[in-house]
Amino acid sequence: MKKGNPKKLDTSDMCGAKIAVQTGTVQEEEANTIAKGCEADNKAEVMSYKRQAEAATAVATGKADAFYADSPVAGYAISQTDGQLEALGDVEGVAKQGIAVKKGNTQLAEAVQKAVQKLMDDGTYMKILKHWGVESGALDKAEINPTDLD
């Protein structure tokens, strides 16, 4: 949303708001669910865009009141707006991110895991995440095929 929350938005009641989302995302589905739960005279308007950058731009230019996206995507968009946008509410449902390597290439997988763990241990990993505004998705341990993906 715009810095300072000029529309006085509240995540517990987005009825009446113009919500920008990227087409085909979970957030688009959730925004449509929110809109369906609003009274007819105070519906949330879901504005779908092909690219997330367009959704963020819609808020920065005043066409939309807020955009809804994954926390790393939202954090990056906010970091790119020179202070025009800010987050509203808490981060929910953080998903783990990964690095894909060819199946069976255990030597490469282990080398990548060790390199990422070194970046975590010396603080470089967090510096990188903070630079891009995506620290909400930070992990504390680099693993190969972790089983606790929630």
Where are these regions (language model features)?
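Ligand-binding clefts/hinges and TM-proximal coupling segments of bilobed small-molecule sensing domains
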Residues: 26-46, 87, 117-150
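Hydrophobic residues within well-ordered alpha-helices
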Residues: 14, 59-60, 99, 112
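Flexible hinge/capping segments at coil-to-helix
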Residues: 2-19
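Periplasmic-binding protein-like
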Residues: 2, 79-117, 135-150
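A ligand-binding cleft/hinge motif common to bilobed small-molecule-binding domains
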Residues: 32-37, 58-93
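Short helix-initiation/N-cap motifs at beta->coil->alpha
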Residues: 6-9, 46-58, 95
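Short amphipathic alpha-helical coupling segments at ligand-binding clamshell hinges
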Residues: 13-15, 70, 104-118, 124-128
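Beta->alpha turn/N-cap motifs
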Residues: 2-3, 22-25, 51-52, 68-75, ...
